[in-house]
Structures are given as C-alpha cells and as structure tokens.
Swiss-Prot record:
Residues 661-687 are annotated as: Disordered. This is TWiK family of potassium channels protein 12. Residues 112-132, 242-262 dip into the membrane without crossing it. Pfam families: Ion_trans_2 (PF07885). Belongs to the two pore domain potassium channel (TC 1.A.1.8) family. It is found in: Membrane. GO terms for cellular component: plasma membrane. Residues 677-687 have a biased composition (Basic and acidic residues). One of its GO terms (molecular function) is potassium ion leak channel activity. Keywords: Glycoprotein, Ion channel, Ion transport, Membrane, Potassium, Potassium channel, Potassium transport, Transmembrane, Transmembrane helix, Transport.
Length: 687
C-alpha cells in the first residue's frame, strides 16, 4: 500500500469529500496569513520600536520645555511670550506624533461634493470600498446598505455584458488587422487539420466565425491599460510614484480597496473612476475568455473520449462479427472474476507522483463529466440503487429466480433480472444499476484499455479514469453520439467503387474513398436483446455471445465474406490494354514490358518458363499464381479503354496497373478479399 493510497484511505475514513472545499478555503487563508506575516511582521516591529523611542523622547523634551518655561523669569512676567512658547511646543508635539495630516483632513473642505458623492456611490456598487468618505449618520448608513443591495447585482450584469461587447469589438478589429497586409506579414497563418489527413466537418464556417478573441492579446491589452492609468495617476497625484500607482490600480480593479492610498485631487476623481471602470471591463473580458476556453477544453476532452469509446466499441464487434449458438454455461458465476483475472496480471509499482497524477486526472475527468450531466432530483435514488446492485446479496439466486429462454434451438437459463433488462419498463424492478444499458459493452472496452500498455501522459490517464467513472453509462445515454465513418481509399482504378459521400462524415480531398457509417452498429438497442451478464467468456474476451437478439447488431452486408478473389482469374485470358493509354510521366522512361503467360495451365507455365515469347505491341498483363490443386473456374476480366483512365495517366503518370500483379502465396487456401464482389455489386465510375 503506497503513501498515496494510505492518504486516500484516510480521506475516505474521515469523509473529507463532504467539506474539503471549506478546508481548502481555510488553507488558502492560512497561506495568505503566513505570507503577509512573513513580510510585514519584522518591519512592523521595527516601526513600533522606533515609534516607542520617539514617544519617550517627545515626552522628555516636552517636559523639559514646560520646566524651562516655568523656571524662566522672563516668560513668567511676560504672558504674551509665554503663550507663544506654549503654542510652539504644542505644534512641535503634533508634528512629532503625525497628527497634522488628520487635523488637515478636517480643516479642508467637505468631501461630500457632487464629485465626492459620485465617487462614494461608485465604491458601493463596484464593491471596492476605499474607506473614504464614509457615512456617519444613521440615515446615510441605511441608504448605503439599500443602495449596495440593488446596485451590486445590476453592476455585475452590466459588467458581464460590457465584457462580451468589448470582446466582440476587439475581435472585429483583430480580424481586420489580420486581413490587412501588415497583419498577414506579422501574424502567422494557422492551418487546422486532423491527424488522419481528412477534413473535419465539425470545423464549419460558423464555428470559425465564433472563434473568440485571443487570450494573450487580451492580457497584453489589460497590462497596457494598467500602465497607462498608473501614469495618469502619477501626473495628477504628485506624491505617488509609478509602482504605487500600479499597486493602487490593481487593488482597485480587483475590488479589494484597501484604503491605504486615496485621491487628493477632488476634481479628477470622476475621471479616475472612469479609468478604473474600463479596467474592470477589461478584467471581466479576460475572465470571460478564460472561462470559455476552459469550457471548450472540457468539451473537447469529452468529445475525444466519446470518440475513443465509439472506436473501441466498433473494434469489439468487428473482432466478433458472428453470433454463434453454444450450450449454456454456469448461471451466475460472477462474470467479472475472469475479467479481473485477465486484466490484473501483475501489480505495477508506481511512485507518489504517478499516483498524484492519476488522482489529478480523475478529478479533472469527474469535473468534465459532471459539467455534462444535468442536475436531477433522483440522484440520491440512483445512488441507493447502485449500492443495492453492488451488494453481495445479488449473487445469491434460487431456482425460482431463473427463467428458461431459447434462441434457435439453444436453451439457456438466465436470471429474471437479466431477462427483465430487455424491457425498459421492467428496469426499475431489476437489480441492474439505472442507466446501465452499456454494461456489457463497457466491460469489454475496459478490458481492452487495461490490456494496453500504460502511458504516463495526462491524456491517457484521463481516458482511463473516464472509463472507470461510474456515471459513464448515464452520460452515454444522455449524450447524442456523433456519426463516425470508416474511410478506405482505393488506388486500383480498374475496380473503383464509388459511393455517395456522407455530408456528415469525413471525406478525403484526393482519391477515391468508400465510407460506411459505423454509428449505431455497436450501440445496444433497447427492447432488442438482453445483455449477457451470466456469460464469463463473452464479457472478458468478446468471442461468444448468448444474447437473445431480435435484430443484428451489425449490418450483414458488411459481415458477409465474398466468395470471389482477385486471384481467381483464368490464365488463358490475356488482359490487353490499348497502347495509347500507356502514357508515362514526362521525363521518365516507360516501364519495361512484362512477360505474361499465354499458356492454358499454370503447371505448363512453370515447366516451360524458358520459352521465348513474341513481343506484342500491346502490353499483356495477367494476374498469375502458383500451381494449386484446387483450381477454380475463374471469371474473365478484360479492361477496356476509358477516357477517364487516359486522363488519370496524363496527370499521375504510372498507375498500379502498369506493374506486375503481386505474387500470391503458395498456400492452397486462398484468402478472399472481396475485391471481385465489390466490382460486381457496385457500379464502376471514375471521379
């Protein structure tokens, strides 16, 4: 048991998940307290020591002056001079105690002018609160509370709206700059493409128009505005330096408002406040862009994980395309036991940081999934049903709990709960967890993922945690899965198969591609079959299925093997290609002519291969094979002249038909590729 696992066990023991956010807030507060105390404590102690020494010095000097005034005979007889000396002593005392500024505050004009009152109102609804001026009367304080309660929500809504508007305006300006000659020269052009070389239909024109304003440029604009506003403050407030002005502006736009620095020019308060408001709008825009980017990152990770699940699900059914009958196996033999034994072959020793990365990947994945799920009122009921399903009482079945089902002559006893799963209406009475329509499929996908070699990158760990999440089945039911398409490119133009291009799927730019939709070929259908929970082998390896299927999971057309092969050609037939079609690439010598066999039997071709042949003006190509005892009557294929082929040769030069056909294997069992069937079933057309 590693250190990280011990920490996880302790957190589960004290139920840390219920109040960890509050503990994080307390920890952040303690960190801030330590940080500020570390930098401010010693300096404050020094200031207090100096102030204490100065206070004692002031006391002594003040006492000496009073004694001097009392003992001086001249001052005793001259009252005017005595009052003057006393006033000088009091002014000196006030200056030493730093009380002159406070006295000057009350000696100046009232701050409750129109500009000062507007500045105070702005402090309230922006939640800055500098602490000057302040309301002293009871009526003023009551009005302050009511004004803040109504003004703060309105200002937050306005700030969000102005942030979006500012983002749109800056985005338009950014587009104009990019389209200009200066922008094309200065800013690089980004080309978006998928990894497999095909176009991404999701990257439509509308989504490209919705591309947000770049975050780095927004942050640079915010920094420029902070520096500009700080320089303006330095011009109006003569006692401020540039770092102090930057500090004041950042504290203001973050709505902290410590109040240690205040404006001393009442005439410029409104203009200064407008600078702060625009800074708040820029900061809100940056937060909005960052939040949108995080949301899009979550959506992207979610879509990638869903696509991986779809591909792996298609691989599961692709490896097991046939549904066969088999005698019944044991009932309720804990089907997950063999899966655990097959996947957990060895325990890998992992360090603390690897466990920490797994924990972080799990938390991020939980956040991504939770953001996609809708808040439902029956969440507690689902948790109770899940706990009931995981209880060991489910494995205890009696003979009364079993039903007998038949499928094409194969008889099998299954549990009532498993059989009831074929009907959605009976789902509430079953022992299957709610929303677990993908149970069998997800078990196979998890087994495939665990068999793969583990990678240390964050994306792989996030996908593994994505599959292990308990809410995956529920989110698969609520998510509208996108349509995927398998794309195969064919270079042999003679047997070209052209199908209608799917507008929603991916398609290649160059060449001929035939795509078939694979979406919904692996998804379990409600009311179609019951998941085979009682089968041990099917859950683990996916090589047998005992389901009661009313409709095939995969189209039989794609699962049907062809009875024809590209090697089943008659050796007596010579395929002749017109000479005018054989146009080589400019600057390249023509390919050497091949020597095809004109004999009727491949055995005679082997015995008389030293025979000389007359060169024919037209190149003769014959698919050849070695001698076999199972010769089958083959079809006669002859390629005719086609203008499209001629055009393709002019553009591409050599085509695969210009070379000898690949030699076949010496094995007597010929592998059927379905090539000839595709030529008979599909029309020949050239794109």
């Amino acid at each position: 048991m590693t250190l990280f696992q011990k920490l996880q066990w302790f957190c589960q023991l004290i139920r840390l998940r219920a109040y960890y956010k509050f503990l994080l807030l307390i920890a952040y507060t303690l960190f801030g307290a330590w940080l500020f105390r570390f930098y401010e404590l010693q300096a404050d102690i020094k200031r207090r020591a100096i102030y204490g020494n100065d206070t004692n010095l002031i006391r002594r000097q003040l006492a000496e002056r009073w004694i001097e005034m009392h003992d001086d005979a001249v001052l005793r007889n001259n009252s005017v001079l005595r009052r003057r000396r006393a006033a000088e002593a009091v002014d000196w005392l006030l200056g030493e105690l730093n009380l002159s500024d406070h006295m000057r505050e009350f000696s100046e004009d009232t701050p409750w002018t129109w500009t000062g009152a507007m500045f105070y109102a702005g402090q309230l609804y922006t939640t800055i609160g500098y602490g000057y001026p302040t309301a002293k009367t009871d009526e003023g304080r009551i009005c302050t509370v009511l004004y803040a309660l109504f003004g703060i929500p309105c200002f937050l809504m306005y700030l969000k709206a102005i942030g979006k508007t500012l983002s749109k305006r800056l985005k338009k300006i950014y587009k104009r700059v990019r389209r200009s000659a200066f922008g094309k020269f200065l800013l690089p052009t980004r080309v978006t493409a998928t990894k497999d070389g095909f176009e991404d239909p999701d990257a439509s024109a509308e989504e490209r128009k919705r591309k947000p304003f770049p975050i780095p440029i927004a942050i640079i604009l915010l920094i420029i505005w902070i520096c500009f506003s700080a320089s303006m403050f330095c011009q109006w407030e003569k006692t401020w330096d540039f770092p102090s002005a930057v500090y004041f502006f950042i504290v203001s736009i973050s709505t902290v408002g410590l109040g240690d620095m205040l404006f001393r020019t009442p005439d410029m308060m409104v203009f200064n406040f407008l600078l702060i408001l625009f800074g708040l709008a820029l900061l809100s825009m940056c937060f909005e862009l960052i939040t949108d980017r995080i949301a899009k990152w979550k959506q992207k990770r979610f879509d990638e994980h869903i696509k991986k699940v779809q591909k792996m699900a298609f691989q599961v059914f692709e490896k097991d395309p046939f549904v066969e009958e088999a005698p019944p196996l044991g009932i309720r033999m804990a089907p997950n036991l063999m899966q655990i034994a097959a996947t957990h072959v060895s325990e890998e020793k992992r360090g603390f940081f690897a466990e920490l990365k797994d924990w972080f990947a799990g938390k991020v994945t939980d956040n991504v999934i939770q953001s996609k799920l809708e808040d439902t009122d029956d969440e507690s009921d689902e948790d109770e049903a899940l706990e009931e399903f995981e209880s060991p009482q489910v494995a205890t079945l009696t003979a009364n709990d079993l039903v007998v089902c038949t499928n094409g002559g194969a008889t099998r006893r299954v549990s009532k709960q498993s059989y009831a799963f074929s009907d959605v209406s009976n789902l509430s009475n079953s022992k299957i967890p709610p929303g677990n329509n993908y149970g069998q499929l997800l078990d196979r996908i998890k087994a495939m993922e665990k068999f793969k070699p583990k990678k240390g990158d964050l994306d792989s760990r996030m996908f593994a945690k994505f599959l292990e999440n308990k809410k995956l089945a529920k989110i698969l039911e609520q998510t509208e899965l996108r349509e995927l398409a398998t794309v195969s490119c064919q270079t042999d133009l003679s047997g070209l198969v052209v199908q209608r291009r799917n507008p929603k799927g991916r398609h290649a730019r160059i060449g001929s591609c035939s795509s078939q939709s694979t979406m919904s070929t692996f998804l379990p259908r409600n009311n179609s079959h019951a998941p085979d929970e009682d089968s041990v082998m099917s859950i683990t390896f996916g090589d047998l299925k005992f389901d009661y299927i009313t409709e095939p999971l995969i189209d039989e057309y794609h699962l049907r093997e062809s009875n024809h092969s590209i090697f089943d050609f008659d050796d007596d037939e010579v395929v002749r290609i017109p000479q005018k079609m054989l146009v080589s690439r400019p600057g390249m010598p023509p390919p050497p002519p091949s020597r095809p066999s004109q004999l009727a039997s491949p055995l005679r071709a082997l015995l008389e291969k030293e025979q000389k042949y007359d060169e024919d003006p037209e190149i003769q190509l014959t698919p050849r094979r070695l001698a076999s005892l199972t010769d089958v009557q083959a079809r006669k294929v002859k390629l005719g002249y086609d203008e499209n082929l001629q055009h393709a040769r002019l553009v591409c030069g050599l085509l695969p038909q210009d070379f000898d056909s690949p030699s076949t294997s010496t094995s007597t069992s010929m592998i059927d590729s379905g090539y000839d069937l595709s030529k008979r079933d599909a029309p020949v057309n050239i794109v």
